[in-house]
Amino acid sequence: AIAVAAGFNPEGGTRNFNFSTRNTHSELCDCISLTRYGYPKDGFFLRAESFYNVASNIDELDEAGGFGPQIKDSYGGRSLHAQSHGESVISLVQNRFGGRGLYLLDEPEAALSPMRLMSLLVAMDGLVKKASQFIICTHSPILMAYPGAEIYQLSDEGIERADYKNTEHYIVTKQFLDNPERMLKYLLEE
């Protein structure tokens, strides 16, 4: 809803993407108003479940041709479909994102291994130091660990601010990694 209210395509991309394969976004976007200080120079909405559609739209626009450079040149010069899902997400962040941007990432961890998540943290840090802002919907304790991150946890009781080590995702992941045998026994034995 935040992405649509900010003017992004519901399926993802920059504000210039206007394709639609299926109208599945929440009507919540009509009920919120955004307040911003200044206007971002750049922006992108990465929605994990429809990033394939964004990559397809880029390829279609490039195949149709135009008067300028190919769109994929802004994404590392290769079709995002010619890369693994994780490689394409990292390529997007490293090549397309720039300073003074607003980047909305919806479950980027769906495509990324733990090592790639750490690469994303490094790339994000460089962009934050160039006055970019990230709003991330994630289940990843690795991404939540970003220094100074404001974390909000959604539950049946509503939305509340949470400390990193008090998030459900951190607690459950730590419990599993601290004693996988015990957790597996609990989960798998009847």
Describe the function of each predicted region.
Residues A1-E63:
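ABC ATPase nucleotide-binding domain signature region
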Residues Y75, S79, Q83-L105, M115-L127:
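GG-anchored amphipathic helix commonly corresponding to the ABC/SMC/Rad50 NBD signature/C-loop
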Residues M115-Q133, S140-E190:
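C-terminal lobe/lid and adjacent interdomain/linker elements of RecA-like ASCE P-loop ATPase modules
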Residues E109-A110:
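Short loop immediately C-terminal to the Walker-B catalytic DE motif
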Residues Y103-D106, Q133-T138:
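Structural recognition of the conserved hydrophobic beta-strand(s) that form the central parallel beta-sheet
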Residues A55-Q83:
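Conserved P-loop NTPase mechanochemical-coupling segment
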Residues Y39-P40, G98-G99, A131:
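Short, well-ordered loop/turn elements at secondary-structure boundaries
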